[in-house]
């Protein structure tokens, strides 16, 4: 549906998959190491469901992350520079109902607007240093670029193709 609405070329997802694997290859602890992956390799991987190919999906895995959250007084005593939480928001919506917007879910747009307002963010592309966005399938990247306000509707794929989300290409919003 995203491809139809945005007129995005079929190889956007392939480019995301290659970029994500190359990013992972820079981390020696990443469980998937494919430093020599190519666009052709992704394009030749078997089709899961059109247009998603096997190498355009994330591998099944379990992971964990931990954060130490403290009051300002304790954070000031930390030997390392703290990262400040300026806003917190959460939204959810049923995954299936008639008329649900699947390309840009309302819950995502509302949640982003809420947390940006709390944190005083007016331009997420310029105001944020990092975003940890779950992209289980390659086509989610351009969709979430739009849904979270990094790009206007129908133009997230252009940021991907320009290299804006690539560390290797010097992108300004590397995911």
Regions found by a protein language model. Give the residues of each.
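Glycine-rich, mobile lid/loop segments that gate access to catalytic sites or pores
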Residues: 1-51
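Phosphate/pyrophosphate-binding loops at sites that engage ATP/ADP/AMP, CoA/4′-phosphopantetheine
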Residues: 3-9, 112-127
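Condensing-enzyme catalytic core mediating Claisen C-C bond formation in acyl metabolism
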Residues: 11-16, 47-114, 162-175
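Acyl-CoA/ACP chain-elongation machinery
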Residues: 17-31, 92-98, 136-141
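Stable alpha-helical structural segments in soluble proteins, enriched in small hydrophobic residues
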Residues: 66, 107, 111-120, 140-148
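Secondary-structure transition/capping motifs at alpha-helix termini
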Residues: 75-77, 119-124, 151
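Short glycine/threonine-rich loop-to-helix capping motif typified by GTGT followed
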Residues: 97-101, 135-158
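Short glycine-rich phosphate-binding loop at a beta-alpha junction
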Residues: 128-133
């Amino acid at each position: 549906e995203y491809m139809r609405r945005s007129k995005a070329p079929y190889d956007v997802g392939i480019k995301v998959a290659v970029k994500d694997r190359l990013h992972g290859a820079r981390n020696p602890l990443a469980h998937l190491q494919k430093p020599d992956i190519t666009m052709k390799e992704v394009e030749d991987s078997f089709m899961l469901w059109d247009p998603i190919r096997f190498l355009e999906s994330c591998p099944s895995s379990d992971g964990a992350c931990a954060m130490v959250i403290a009051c300002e007084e304790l954070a000031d005593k930390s030997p390392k520079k703290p990262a400040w939480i300026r806003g917190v928001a959460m939204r959810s919506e049923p995954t299936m109902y008639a008329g649900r917007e699947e390309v840009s879910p309302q819950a995502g747009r509302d949640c982003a607007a809420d947390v940006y307002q709390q944190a005083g963010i007016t331009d997420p592309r310029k105001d944020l240093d990092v975003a940890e966005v779950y992209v289980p399938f390659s086509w989610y990247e351009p969709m979430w670029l739009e849904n979270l306000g990094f790009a206007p509707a129908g133009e997230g794929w252009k940021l991907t193709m320009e290299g804006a989300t690539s560390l290797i290409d010097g992108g300004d919003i590397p995911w």
